[in-house]
Amino acid sequence: MNKKLKDVLLKLDQDLIKHVKGSLDLEISGVTYSSKLVLPRYVFFALPGIRFDGHDFIETAIQKGSNVIVCSRDMDFYSPNVTYIKVDDFNIRKFMSNFSNIFYDEPSKKLKVIGVTGTDGKSSVCYYIYLLLKKKGVKVGFISTVFFDDGNGSLIKNPYRQSTPESTEIHLFLSNMVKNNVQYAILESTSHGLDLKTARLIDVNYFAVVFTNIGHEHLEFHGTIQNYLNAKLGLFRSVSDDAGFGVINFDDPYYSDFKNAVKKSFTYSLKSSKADFFVSFIDEKIDSTRFEFYHKGVKYFANVSLLGSFNVENIMAALILVSQILNSDIQDIVDKLICIKSLDGRMDSVNLGQNFSVIIDYAHTPGAFSKLFPIFKRFATNRLISVFGSAGERDVAKRFLQGQIADIYSDLIVLCDEDPRGENSMYIIKDIAKGIVNKVVNQDLFFIPDRRLAIEKAISLARAGDLVVALGKGHENSIIYKNKELFWNEQEAVKNAILSLEESEKDR
């Protein structure tokens, strides 16, 4: 895609631009904030950051062919034949989003975009909506923590550690969806992505939105629960189309805030018949869940190959969204639930023939813990052994809560790294341990920062009938430390630990 710089700038808010040095009559072919991704005639945005400053990479970007630099401070040296656009620090991300949206011809306006937000369940709801729409024969694309599909029909793993990528990537991906004749685009819309500080999603035109729940997460970024809530409410307030609507979890304490933020909405509940869709019965088995729900006085019977009442919530959100967006008969969508399958890293069972069970899950918040641990305890025929950590440089207050919940349900706990980042691993582990009051260190509570060794320890402790749960990493392919990222595969780590245990038992 090629455009004239002046044609893009003419459509942008001129108040955001402080100064332009150089020609506007340049041809540009791409937009990026990463010097690693720069190609000839790319616009390079020098974003200020926590660890790195994009201004330090301007010369690298120019050497690789960038002919337009967007910066927030004056340069000591200006390269000839390069145009410099100066904006405020505070506005540079907003300007990048505006610019990307215009450069890619406002792709979200050519799609019906579905946004899913909430503390827990976002990725699963996105995936279930994706599967149901595909089952209905609809051309669909999506962006989530785990997978991307730009409409070419194949899933690729999310190449970023961000659930919601930067605006340059969002609009490029939406543009590819338009090229692939996608009708519906599903975006996992995180609070980080919705926040005006990152401005990743401010230029996305949403048609329908889903709210799953609000829990204790990301307060290190938002500061207060109210700021966190407001970021998510922004998604609902952005639905401008008169035909647009929201799907809301009636059981969440903040339900009314979301209902008031959108003109039209549908609610679901596992507790109250006042909701538009009320789940009246749930029967959980180890490999499936049967449930019944009412809508407008009609009773529906559903069965899915997933475990847990929390998954019933996620299924209901997806079912309602798809039935309403397609104006389909409810029973028709219920019949399609056979296509629903678990997302990678969500309630993944690892069975190599061992006499105990192992489950891997991405759960990393107190809300997710409070939903999953009762299920784990119920299906553990003997002891429950949990392995988990908590993210470094993230919400500190949740660590105590994670430990407290795990302590109630677990017989043995092994604490380890999740993503320590710049924090000391043992400091994080000891923060979690403050919530664990019913265990004794080195008897039924173990501090092993190295996640591989921690999993090996948990597996070595397992007896017949035990359930070992490894939480917090799920699908993720790395563990982040201060100065490095360690490749990680939770499935492989668990499998190797089981195989090592079997080998050691043979040698006895």
UniProtKB/Swiss-Prot annotation:
Q: Which keywords fit this entry according to its UniProt record?
A: ATP-binding, Cell cycle, Cell division, Cell shape, Cell wall biogenesis/degradation, Cytoplasm, Ligase, Nucleotide-binding, Peptidoglycan synthesis
Pathway recorded for this protein: Cell wall biogenesis; peptidoglycan biosynthesis
Query: What Enzyme Commission number(s) appear in the record?
Result: 6.3.2.-
List, in alphabetical order, the Gene Ontology terms for molecular function in this entry.
acid-amino acid ligase activity; ATP binding; magnesium ion binding
Q: Where in the cell is it found?
A: Cytoplasm
Gene Ontology BP annotations = cell division; cell wall organization; peptidoglycan biosynthetic process; regulation of cell shape
Q: What is the lineage of its organism?
A: Bacteria, Pseudomonadati, Spirochaetota, Spirochaetia, Spirochaetales
Q: Which residues bind UDP-N-acetyl-alpha-D-muramoyl-L-alanyl-D-glutamate?
A: 35, 163-164, 190, 200
- According to its UniProt record, which protein family does this protein belong to? Belongs to the MurCDEF family. MurE subfamily.
What is the protein's given name? Answer: UDP-N-acetylmuramyl-tripeptide synthetase
Q: Mind telling me which InterPro entries this protein's record contains? A: Mur-like_cat_sf, Mur_ligase_C, Mur_ligase_C_dom_sf, Mur_ligase_cen, Mur_ligase_N, MurE/MurF_N, UDP-N-AcMur-Glu-dNH2Pim_ligase
Function per UniProt: Catalyzes the addition of an amino acid to the nucleotide precursor UDP-N-acetylmuramoyl-L-alanyl-D-glutamate (UMAG) in the biosynthesis of bacterial cell-wall peptidoglycan.
Keyword Ligase found: yes
Post-translational modifications: Carboxylation is probably crucial for Mg(2+) binding and, consequently, for the gamma-phosphate positioning of ATP.
- Note the Pfam families from the entry: Mur_ligase, Mur_ligase_C, Mur_ligase_M
Binding site residues for ATP: 118-124
